[in-house]
Amino acid sequence: LSRDYDISVQGQAYLLRPDTPREGIIRQPRPGEADGQLSEPLRSQASEANLIMRPPGVTPNTLRILEATEYAQRQGIFMEFHHAAYQAYWEDGLDLGDLAVIEGLAQQVSLNSTELMERLESSFYTNTIMEQYQQALGYGIRGIPTFVVGNLLFTGAHPYEIFTSAISKVLAGENS
């Protein structure tokens, strides 16, 4: 989208399951999941958005990966880190709560992994993440991904055309 429009993307943290223990939990298959495929409607939404999504084996505690994402955003490479984390979780089945996985992602996108790991160990971004989460709850957000384009808010995986339509409406002044 940023190639087609003069826009910037800013990530905000949302703890989907804030009660998940730090070590994560083994994910139980949901009704309708089979042969490495997600259940509906998520399977169709992912397909329409040209996304690869396989059921992961672990539901991670996402606080540390969200903190790492905040670090990446402050380094100016939010999208690169976000894409690497997405691929690690949904395509490769890696545990995003695992510090070794996070360190590998940081190295993959050329972040200073030593500095990042120090910040994760010291909970440097925890307050920022919790403030963003509380703000999202205040807006009534209860799921991910959620997108805000102007005054338009929508949740879930969507085809590219949905985003271009929303951006076009905002740019045309139809921002309600």
Where are these regions (language model features)?
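Short, structured active-site "lid" loops
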Residues: I26-E48
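Dinucleotide-binding Rossmann-like beta1-alpha1 core, especially the glycine-rich loop
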Residues: R30, P56-L63
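C-terminal cap of thioredoxin/glutaredoxin-like
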Residues: L1-I7, G11, R30-E33, E70, ...
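Conserved N-terminal beta-strand and adjoining loop/helix that marks the start
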Residues: R64-A68
